Amino acid sequence: MKPVPTYVQDKDESTLMFSVCSLVRDQAKYDRLLESFERFGFTPDKAEFLAADNREGNQFHGFSWHKQMLPRCKGRYVIFCHEDVELVDRGYDDLVAAIEALEEADPKWLVAGVAGSPWRPLNHSVTAQALHISDVFGNDRRRGNVPCRVESLDECFLLMRRLKPVLNSYDMQGFHYYGADLCLQAEFLGGRAYAIDFHLHHYGRAIADENFHRLRQEMAQKYRRWFPGRILHCVTGRVALGGGWYEAR
């Protein structure tokens, strides 16, 4: 039988606007997320919901789960978010408007989020932040100016185009710094990362455990060969990448 090819066009023909992907351990927290997204306009004709299932144990980690989810996504834009976020006063129309404004301002954007650190800040004595979020540190918090270009993003809410994906490193694993890694990979691809103004509530609490410090060291060791001397600002603190190729092991 003669093969029947599919002719692919250079355009996004998806009828869905969003694929909302979540890394899920706690079903109750995820149910709260689902209810809030539905309440704020992410209806079945506009969005699909996919869950990386860690309810029975960690079969996915931060650097791996995006890769598993992307091939299954059908939306024009893919959201990667924690299970413990909740929409509180911004919804579907607000996010679409924020994306459209970003598209017009900088077509080279590849990754966006709601909390990050401004790109290449001049002052390294304090950690630079750009965000609008409610979290364990306070309600309706604002730091810096959003939208703005950033060099790292918090993992609680990440966004990219399905047809312009950015993947995390294959040589790292864990649940910390994969947002920063994603932004640095976007730089390698010739793109940029942005923090946008899309207020939501993140109930999570960052834990600086042994794995946090291990990944911090691995990030510095990995990226110093390409960015020698750079001080990378993240919402959880600064990472001094160190020297050049002679320090890479």
Curated annotation (Swiss-Prot):
It comes from the Bacteria. InterPro entries: Nucleotide-diphossugar_trans. This is ATP synthase subunits region ORF 6. It comes from Fuscovulum blasticum. The lineage of its organism: Bacteria, Pseudomonadati, Pseudomonadota, Alphaproteobacteria, Rhodobacterales.
